[in-house]
Each structure stands twice: as C-alpha cells, then as structure tokens.
Amino acid sequence: MPRALDKTISEILSKYGETPKEACWDCHGVWVVYHKAIERMAARAGITFDQPTVIEASAANKTAVICVTGTMADRSEWSFGEASPANNKNAYPFAMAEKRAKDRVVLKLLGLHGLA
C-alpha cells in the first residue's frame, strides 16, 4: 500500500497542470513523478537548459555522465545524469543520462527535489 502523497507535491503538480493520478506512480512505497509529466511541467514553467557538459562518454562501455544546467526565471540549478550497465538496462545510455540530469534539474527548480 502506498503512503499518502505529500500535500506539497499535489500543490506543485496542480500549479503546473498535472494531477497525482496521471503524473505519479508508487515505487515500493516512494512516490515518483513520471518523466513525461516532468517534461510537461518544465515546458509550462518556461524552464530552459544550457548545452550539457559531457563528463564521461564511452559508447563501447555503454556509459555516459553529463552535467546539465537549467534556468527558470532568475533561478538556475545544475545536476548530473549518469547511465552505465550498473544502473541502466536500456540500449541508449546517452539519452538516459540526459533524461536523468534534466529531470533532476526540473525537480529542483519546481521545488519537488527530495519530495518526489
């Protein structure tokens, strides 16, 4: 049984046109926001991203680490995204690293980081 969703999460989702039912799923008792919902909220919030900085890239080893900076109004946040065989089963580690980095930045800018 999932724990109750934090009221702050519901309020922030609503502010950016999302509902918990459509935007979230319960991952073993922890609420997680779907990537597609994060992308929609980022667009609605006017979040923009700088060109990512590649920290490590190896197609042969299927590893990618990037640093992404995003801006919303006058605030900026940055975060890493990483993918390797140890934490990624997909055949596209570079796209997965980008997704993870951008999602983390958006969660920080929207005030959801650490909540969802």
Predicted regions and their residues:
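Polyanion-binding surfaces on beta-sheet-dominated domains and ring/shell assemblies
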Residues: 1-116
